[in-house]
């Protein structure tokens, strides 16, 4: 499953929507909730990012992300 993680680069300032960034990770999980938990853990262990939201991408959403040219899987 591929998850889209919305984050701020630092935890030191209040989040601002205009500064929200995204990354994409692949997670093997039994269900969506376990995948979100695993994605959060993976990102928190490897970065100092302030995670705002984690979203499971549907096939159509993934296809759209690839078409827009912003899709790139992040590996830690």
Curated annotation (Swiss-Prot):
This is DNA-directed RNA polymerase subunit epsilon. Signal peptide: none annotated. NCBIfam families: PRK13667.1. Keywords: DNA-directed RNA polymerase, Nucleotidyltransferase, Transcription, Transferase. HAMAP family: RNApol_bact_RpoY (MF_01553). The gene is rpoY. It catalyses: RNA(n) + a ribonucleoside 5'-triphosphate = RNA(n+1) + diphosphate. One of its GO terms (cellular component) is DNA-directed RNA polymerase complex. The lineage of its organism: Bacteria, Bacillati, Bacillota, Bacilli, Lactobacillales. RNAP is composed of a core of 2 alpha, a beta and a beta' subunit. The core is associated with a delta subunit, and at least one of epsilon or omega. When a sigma factor is associated with the core the holoenzyme is formed, which can initiate transcription. Its EC number is 2.7.7.6. GO terms for molecular function: DNA binding; DNA-directed RNA polymerase activity. GO terms for biological process: DNA-templated transcription. InterPro entries: RpoY. It comes from the Bacteria. The keyword Nucleotidyltransferase applies. A non-essential component of RNA polymerase (RNAP). Belongs to the RNA polymerase subunit epsilon family.
């Amino acid at each position: 499953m591929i998850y889209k993680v919305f984050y701020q680069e630092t935890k030191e300032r209040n989040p601002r929507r205009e500064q929200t960034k995204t990354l994409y990770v692949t997670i093997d999980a039994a269900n969506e909730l376990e995948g979100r938990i695993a994605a959060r853990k993976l990102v928190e262990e490897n970065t100092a990012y302030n995670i705002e939201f984690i979203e499971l991408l549907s096939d159509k959403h993934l296809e759209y992300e690839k078409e827009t040219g912003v899709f790139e899987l992040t590996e830690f």
